[in-house]
Amino acid sequence: MSDDVNSSATSTSSSTVHFDDTPFEDVYEIETELGSGQFAVVRRVRDRKTGEKYAAKFIKKRRYATSRRGVTRQNIEREVRVLQKIRGNSNVVELHAVYETASDVIIVLELVSGGELFDHVCAKECLDEVEAAAFIKQILLAVRHLHSLHIVHLDIKPENVMLKQRGDSQIKIIDFGLSREIEPGAVVKDMVGTPEFVAPEVVNYEALSPATDMWAVGVVTYILLSGGSPFLGDNRDETFSNITRVRYHFSDRYFKNTSKHAKDFIYRLFVRDVDQRATVEECLQHPWIRGPEGNAIDIRKASCITISHIQSFKTRQRWKRCVELVMVLLKASKSSRRIGDGRFDEEDMVASCTLICAEEGNLRALHKLSALHKLLPNATRKSLKSSFSEPNGATAMHCAAKYGHAEVFNYFHMKGGNICARDDNGDTPLHVACRFAQHTVAGYVANEKIDVDSINKTGETALHCAVESADTRVVRLLLQLRPRLDLPNASGDTVLHLAADSINPRIVPLLVCLAPPLHLRNIREETPLHVAAARGHVDCVQALLDANSPIDAVEQDGKTALIIALENGNVDIASILITNGCDINHADHHGDTALHIASKHGLLQAVQTLCHCAVTVDSVNANKKTALHLAAHYGHVDIIRVLLLARADVTLRGDDGLTAELVAVAAERLEAHSLLKMVKSQEIREEYISQLYPLDTSLRRIKLKLLGHSQSGKTRLVQTLHSSRGISSFLESVTRRISDHYSPSSSMKDDGIHSTNGSFVSESNNNSSFDLAAAAGSKYAPPHSQYTRGIDVQTVNINGCGEFSVWEFGGYEPMHTCYDHFVGNADCIHLILYRTSDPTEVQYKQILYWMNFLKGRVTPFEPIGHCGFSSRRSKVIIVGTHATSSLFPQMNQEGEYVSSDIEAMLNTVRLRFETHFDMDHRLILLDATNPSCIGMKTLKMELAKCRTNILAKLLKPLAILDTVVNHLNLVRKKHANFPVITWPDFIQLVRNEINPLTGDAHCRQIVQQLQLIGELVYLRNDLCDADYVVLNAEWFGTHILGQLLSAEFLSKASPNGSYHTSSLAKIFPEIPEQSDLMTILEVLQLCAPDARTGAHEFPVFIQTEAPDSIWRPYSLKEKERDTVYGGVRILPMRGMERSLHSTFPRIQVALRRSINDYQPAKDTQLHQWSECSKLVSQDREAVIRMVGDAVEIRARGPSESATSMFYFMEDLINLVEHAAAEVGPGISLERHFISPKHLKEHREHPALFPPESMMEMQQRESLSVKGTQDEEELFTDVVCFGSRDVARHLTLGIDVGVADLQMASRCELACLLDPPHAMGRDWSILAVKLQLTDQVPDVDSTGQSLSRTDQLLNEWAIHHPEQASVGNLCRILVELGRCDARDALYRTVPLYVFAPLEDQFLLETNDSGVVSSCHSSSEHNPINI
């Protein structure tokens, strides 16, 4: 039991024991090992001064509270205190001294060298009871000494009764490791001792007492007299049963000659009741111990103990140990013998089993083996018989180190294992542990203060091995020991070379911190920078450069780090080297420069960077070839363009006499040859080059975008701004634009399109008529017949302001669904118009709508400015139209209309949106019919100022831009019927027809500038890689979108929104390929193909209302009872109401696409109606619909598939949120979960669980959440459909890291906490709460440019990542008294983050039939539910 039962940590005193920290080996010389235990080894030592010999017990300390290795300091101190207290008795081992090292406590005791008492008895020919009683009396005297001091030994057994010297009869009690100090009345319970010798109270876990030792004395006496163990059974359970029942007997075979006094002595000790058991004093007075009184005959002399019985006992013990040893060996080697891997050696079973246990980490077997045989931790295998075996010479410690078995390694070390042993490769265990990234073992060895710079046969130190393992923990550990960093291995590589070539880029910065030599070279003459440049880790290269590594050092072939980086395709590293000032014109031994290498390998970015840094472009190599020759030979046309722009000489010839053009011909590089041929002339080449340089002037125009509801005066304002000549000029320009670009076909006036048959009247003219009376009952009725259709685009030169591309966005609401493709850029001016004749409430709602519309469609930019201001605010001017003197009788000194009500309203709007928009503080009220009104002049002044400010921030136009603009007019005529081309076609158009040297970057800049001046529209295609360029924005906005989304078309459209491609020919007969137009409409996400019908579905056209029966209880009560419900409403953040209405058709498009993308969708059906969709997937169904301002999702399915229902719902939520984010990236969404209980009851108005309630529940660590109707439900039911498996994989919102906060959350906090607070509850006090006072000066130094709150949160996430969670931040905000900031955080953080369940769990589930483009998992696979 002493080996298998852990001792308790009962302290004997509250005082701390102090040990001598003098180096032990300075005082004593360590000699042979005398014995060992689990965590201790006893060795004979000799005092260096006196020569006196002692027994030193080396006890391994437990280093960590959670570790299982070693003995706790509390237990060691307890043993020392016991030994100190019991000094001075001749029958107890004497304490001499106690020392302490980093890993051990060494207890120095008197040397007891006489051996065990029983061995002494076995050596005698005979032994009578008098001698036996004398031995027992000495044990009793020792026990009396202990008990008088309230010490209980608890492990009295034959092995702990020793003779002081060989041949001497004086005994000593040893081993006080389990001893306790038990004061009278104290209750101490513990399972300690050796099974055969423990008392019943130990087995029954009852209070220990001095009587516990007396039971053990009885067992020792029984064995001494008979040679048999009184309670020993076939197994431990039987032994314990015998003890608790006090089941023993005096066999005639062994006790035939034993005196009755001896039997009575034993009988008095084997008493279950501790109060009735004989005490030590009673035992000393017992006749068998005391002997006869006076001259009485001593009957003990007549009783002679049969020595053979004791010898048999010892023999049985030895045989038992041998059998147990064989069993342990066979069991430990079972796996090796079964697979026959050659590790088990029958000729050396103990050594081979030791090695096997070391490899397998079988500490339990080692404990058993150690108890039966001396361990051989330094043994090695004789030969290699399999690939599994370790190298020759590998000891058990090498094996344990390789496989990371730290406890086994520690055990071997305590058993005398050589921690510095070397195998045949010269590796020590530290080398092996580091090579295999076993940081725990490496840490153990490192703490033993061994030579960390020891090298093996290949010159490697342990640090070499650690770096090769790429394990940062091991490297950090070794660096704490300050190893040498300049030692090379057999290849000449220092640890820095190896780190530069490691797969782990974090090692080089660690080494660089210790200032290693950076100039050392390996046998290839490479510095670490060369190696890092070849490997490709940017962080490594940067760290070496920051440490002043020689940047232009050359290796054996004359190559610098720059050339090596380019040879390996590491362009990012090449850019860093160039930025740090390396020699870009250096040539290697072959004459190749970095430009030659980059041109040869097609590294366009590198060539561009080198040319930008004025590299010598015509440098020749050993073959007289320039970079242009190499680019021509390998056909890198884009690089040829860059070299020509850098004015490379096209006439230079190589050693073969060929120019670059001829080289391209010889290599059959036709495109390269064509390009070089076109620029052969110096004059033409210079002209092309000059076109691709920016001009000194600004762009000719910018966009002016007008937004407002119908009848807000947009068209009339544009008319007035267009020309001082008034409406006749405007009508003339409209007529000209229509006649130039397209003409309405006659069929469009007579024949419309329908899913079956039908017609409608439609005209492309913006001012076409519409029968309002006929459409009075239609949901698509416009407010007036002359409403703007789509987006009217025209160029206007405003007198005194300059030229603008004016984009008038129609106010007709169905058109809003596609406006996100045309708004969102900050490099333009937005005019929001409202009618001053409308009631103030109407004005306010309309302005809020368009401000929110713009805010939602403008992507917020980093960094966050002071008070949450966006770094790039769009310019917005709010203009009141229809202003007359009758409405505004008061004017200011400049003659402008004045209105305190409107001024107050606009101030409210400015305060609400100033973080996102740059808004003018002047009140602009005008009459659009009067070009000379003061308000018009004010507007023009503001437009001129804004235009100047925006143009000043934009890049200067390329000289080629005007040429492209002029050429586009010709291209538009060529593509008049369908002015749309792909992006690759546009690039080829520019190169083939304008300038062949135009690169991709030039084309991107040209298109960007053409968009800024309103010449075309660039459509990004998420369906495939081919983006599109619309050459005529007016055609696109008015003729296509204005017609398809007009009231005329919508009122006659197919009720189910389904159209075949051929149907488009009836609307747009002039377009030759209707499939091209359908593709463009798909790119705009106005439609999606329906795989079942082969037609395209246009959700915006759908007029059919959803039936009332789409969400009713199941007719079968059993099915309804076994159904789980769930739901959520996705709302825009507070203050952005009605932001999702225009996005719902796009959500329906995304739903249809998801069904198409999911191939095995035969069991999945999607039905769509106006503002409602229903998805049925096998036995699950969901309804997605607009409810007020929210998109509501309700789902239900079988209760046994609750986990799959969560997946189903989660995918739908992600799909809706992703679709909404594509339309409005600035719309922050909230999830309001619906009561599953109320859904199951089919209540008309179910309770909701808003984000604040969900987050508050998490903060309280509650399991239930309270809804809006004050009813509580379990969080798992509300979110997880009752699935606890799902709940276990959720990361709650309070546990989300601050570093992962979305920008909306950060902006809200900045807006609330950046401004100074009257009570000081702002960012400065927050810094104190976050323990970031040291960072305050740096944060405060940024002034008004950056948000101090946002910077603080970033610092918190960096310096305290474990504490920087949303939950902790919310708690701190409450302590700060800023519940408003907490509530804002509650509304904007994710309520949970979901990690998908294990694959084996998912295999048991079915598929949902929904593909979410924002799925929680790392891969965009179909959802497995």
Curated annotation (Swiss-Prot):
Its EC number is 2.7.11.1. Expressed in epidermis, muscles and neurons. Signal peptide: none annotated. Its main location: cytoplasm. It catalyses: L-seryl-[protein] + ATP = O-phospho-L-seryl-[protein] + ADP + H(+); L-threonyl-[protein] + ATP = O-phospho-L-threonyl-[protein] + ADP + H(+). Residues 1308-1389 form the Death domain. InterPro entries: Ankyrin_rpt (IPR002110), Ankyrin_rpt-contain_sf (IPR036770), DEATH-like_dom_sf (IPR011029), Death_dom (IPR000488), Kinase-like_dom_sf (IPR011009), P-loop_NTPase (IPR027417), Prot_kinase_dom (IPR000719), Protein_kinase_ATP_BS (IPR017441). ATP binds at L34, G35, S36, G37, Q38, F39, A40, V41, V42, K57. Residues 695-950 form the Roc domain. Disruption phenotype: Beginning in the L3 stage, animals display striking and progressive defects in morphology of the epidermis and cuticle in several body regions, particularly in the nose, tail, vulva, and the dorsal midline in the region of the posterior pharyngeal bulb. The cuticle in these regions becomes up to 5-10 times thicker than the wild-type, at the expense of underlying epidermis. Up-regulates innate immune responses to damage. Decreases starvation-induced autophagy. Disorganization and hyper-stabilization of epidermal microtubules and reduced microtubule growth rates. Residues 28-289 form the Protein kinase domain. Keywords: ANK repeat, ATP-binding, Cytoplasm, Cytoskeleton, Developmental protein, GTP-binding, Immunity, Innate immunity, Kinase, Magnesium, Metal-binding, Nucleotide-binding, Repeat, Serine/threonine-protein kinase, Transferase. Belongs to the protein kinase superfamily. CAMK Ser/Thr protein kinase family. DAP kinase subfamily. Interacts with ptrn-1. Negative regulator of epidermal barrier repair and innate immune responses to wounding. The role in epidermal tissue integrity and wound healing is established through the inhibition of epidermal microtubule stability, possibly via the negative regulation of the microtubule minus-end binding protein ptrn-1. In epidermis, prevents expression of specific unc-44 isoforms probably by promoting nuclear localization of pinn-1, which in turn may affect sydn-1-ssup-72-mediated regulation of alternative polyadenylation of unc-44 mRNA. This is Death-associated protein kinase dapk-1. It comes from Caenorhabditis elegans.
